[in-house]
């Protein structure tokens, strides 16, 4: 019985630690909502095992507004570096905003199993 309690406590600690870390990411920090912050809107389609476009280029310091439409089936959009993971229902458009604060390449993927080609449903955001 003591062994089970130790495992439960260890698991709870791991889960709490993980939740605390994910809270450090903010898709849109309060300062990024100021009027003088550059903005860029991008339309994205999620369809049968692909995102179109699958490469998105933005400038560092930009507030990015993604308008993502799932045109075929239910998908997900996960951009882990920015703490984003959203469900995309078929024929729905979801608005996702994030602040591209730091240069680099950040992968995104479908986070909702959508069929045999699911693992290849990926893309990247390039912050220049």
Regions found by a protein language model. Name each.
Residues 12, 30, 54-56, 82, ...:
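Short linear sequence elements within intrinsically disordered, low-complexity coil regions
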Residues 1-48:
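Extracytoplasmic entry segments of secretory-pathway proteins
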Residues 37-43, 54-73, 92-102, 126-127:
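Beta-strand cores of secreted/periplasmic/IMS beta-sandwich domains, seen most often
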Residues 46-54, 79-83, 91-95, 108-109:
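N-terminal post-signal-peptidase region of extra-cytosolic proteins
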Residues 9, 34, 48, 56-58, ...:
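Generic marker of residues within folded, mature protein domains
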Residues 76:
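Pre-active-site segment of Zn-dependent metallo-hydrolases
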Residues 19-31, 88-128:
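Extracellular/periplasmic metallocenter environments
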Residues 3-4, 38, 79, 83-85, ...:
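Generic structural signal for short, solvent-exposed loop/turn connectors between secondary structure elements
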């Amino acid at each position: 019985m003591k062994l089970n309690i130790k495992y439960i406590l260890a698991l709870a600690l791991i889960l709490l630690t993980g939740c605390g870390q994910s809270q450090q990411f903010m898709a849109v920090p309060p300062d990024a909502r100021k009027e003088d912050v550059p903005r860029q809107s991008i339309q994205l389609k999620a369809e049968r095992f692909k995102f179109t476009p699958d490469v998105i280029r933005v400038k560092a310091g930009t507030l990015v507004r993604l308008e993502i439409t799932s045109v075929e089936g239910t998908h997900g959009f996960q951009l882990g570096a920015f703490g984003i993971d959203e469900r995309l229902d078929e024929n729905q458009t979801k608005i996702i905003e994030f602040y591209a604060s730091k240069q680099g390449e950040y992968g995104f993927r479908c986070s909702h199993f959508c069929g045999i080609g699911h693992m290849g449903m990926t893309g990247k955001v390039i912050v220049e």
